[in-house]
């Protein structure tokens, strides 16, 4: 040590162990740590005593938010000598890290243990991998086959926290979840619900999105049964949802689960730029679950929004999304179910009706031109259905005449 230009400091009075710094920062003053990959820092430990000391670093307990390893794991230091230790950290989420790291020495001659501490003090870059401690869960606002949705707060914003059911025990579901998160992270569209991020830590897995004050279009239909939402607002919400579908389709993505339940209403103010937003896209796992049970007897779902070609187990294409949007338009303008239980007692009756090429007739509360547009969306032949941008044009012309 006496030939080194490294400045050593005492860890505590009378301790034979010296160190070059008490805080391990990974150069955090200049660079935020990347999430999901390792960053290295170096710390020097010296033996200022006469006896040989075995030195190692240990953390008190396993941490959910980062992985830590030290190289070399153990060194025998003779008196007057020092050694470099490499500290590697891999953050698993966006977080600030302040953690005590024990420096444990064992005097071989005297059989005495020396315990000192240094501090890891660093911060990561901002990512969509969320620190669960930043989420404040307030109250339950919904539940489905996927899990439970809570209202919460994340960095001062009202958010929806979707906690997944038993996902950590299902490897396929976890892979599907990660794929969906990867896709959501890339979306930049005003008409798709804003994605803040997700928690990947086992037993805390959840997705965090923008909170929609009015819930889904489906929620509004149930709650506002006796309050008629103006035709203008119905058209506007559907235009917004169609713009979300257009964004997905132009990027080669299929929604696969378009229905009033997956259109969220953020505002019913007619002057708002955006009133409705799409959510729950790419839910191929929902489709797969339904396809394995085409008789619809186990309560997994109904074929209400499924195009005839999907019921016949053909490949899913953009036109199947258009069909689903046609049924969604029917229910929105009618402000009720397309296939009420009174007329369709069993889910297979709906599938049978659709496969025969039959469709619901125009109810009195759907104007003729709008019903004509709906029929162009739910045509039996996929190639006869309108592309989404043509639907937007027609809806916008209806809006102008309101």
Which stretches of residues belong to each language-model region?
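Regulatory alphaC helix of protein kinase catalytic domains
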Residues: 177-182
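Activation segment signature within eukaryotic-like protein kinase domains
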Residues: 237-238
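Conserved catalytic-loop aspartate of Hanks-type protein kinases
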Residues: 321
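Conserved activation segment of eukaryotic-like protein kinases, specifically the C-terminal portion
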Residues: 295-309
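A short, aromatic-enriched beta-strand patch in the conserved N-lobe beta-sheet
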Residues: 197-198
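Conserved short submotifs of the Hanks-type protein kinase catalytic core
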Residues: 202-216, 220
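Protein kinase glycine-rich loop
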Residues: 138-149
């Amino acid at each position: 040590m006496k030939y080194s230009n490294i400045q050593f400091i005492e860890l505590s009075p009378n301790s034979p162990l010296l160190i070059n710094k008490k805080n391990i920062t990974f150069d955090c003053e200049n660079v935020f740590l990347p999430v999901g990959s390792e960053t290295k820092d170096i710390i020097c430990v010296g033996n200022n005593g006469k006896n040989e000391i075995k030195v190692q670093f240990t953390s008190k307990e396993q941490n959910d938010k980062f992985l830590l390893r030290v190289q070399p794991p153990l060194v025998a230091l003779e008196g007057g000598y020092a050694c470099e230790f490499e500290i590697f950290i891999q953050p698993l989420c966006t977080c600030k890290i302040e953690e005590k790291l024990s420096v444990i020495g064992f005097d071989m001659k005297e059989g005495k243990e020396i315990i000192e501490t240094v501090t890891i003090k660093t911060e990561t870059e901002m990512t969509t991998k969320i620190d669960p401690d930043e989420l404040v869960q307030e109250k339950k606002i919904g539940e489905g086959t996927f899990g439970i949705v809570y209202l919460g707060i994340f960095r001062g914003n009202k958010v929806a926290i979707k906690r997944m059911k038993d996902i950590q025990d299902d490897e396929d579901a976890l892979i599907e979840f990660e794929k969906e998160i990867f896709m959501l992270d890339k979306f930049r569209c005003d008409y798709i619900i804003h994605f803040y991020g997700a928690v990947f830590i086992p037993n805390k897995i959840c997705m965090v999105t923008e909170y929609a004050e009015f819930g889904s279009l489906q929620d509004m239909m149930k709650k506002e049964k006796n309050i008629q939402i103006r035709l203008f607002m119905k058209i506007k919400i559907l235009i917004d949802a169609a713009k979300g579908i257009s964004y997905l389709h132009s990027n080669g993505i299929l929604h696969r689960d378009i229905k009033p339940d997956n259109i969220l209403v953020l505002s019913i103010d007619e002057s708002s730029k955006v009133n409705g937003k799409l959510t729950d896209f790419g839910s191929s796992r929902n489709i797969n679950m339904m396809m394995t049970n085409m008789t619809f007897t186990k309560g997994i779902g109904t074929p209400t929004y499924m195009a005839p070609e999907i019921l016949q187990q053909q490949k899913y294409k953009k036109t199947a999304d258009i069909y689903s949007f046609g049924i969604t338009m029917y229910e929105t303008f009618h402000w009720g179910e397309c296939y009420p239980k009174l007329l369709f007692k069993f889910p297979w009756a709906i599938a049978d009706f659709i496969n025969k090429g039959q469709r619901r007739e125009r109810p009195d509360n759907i104007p003729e031109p709008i019903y004509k547009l709906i029929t162009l969306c739910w045509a039996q032949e996929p190639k006869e259905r309108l592309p989404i941008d043509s639907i937007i044009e027609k809806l916008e012309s209806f809006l102008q005449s309101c």
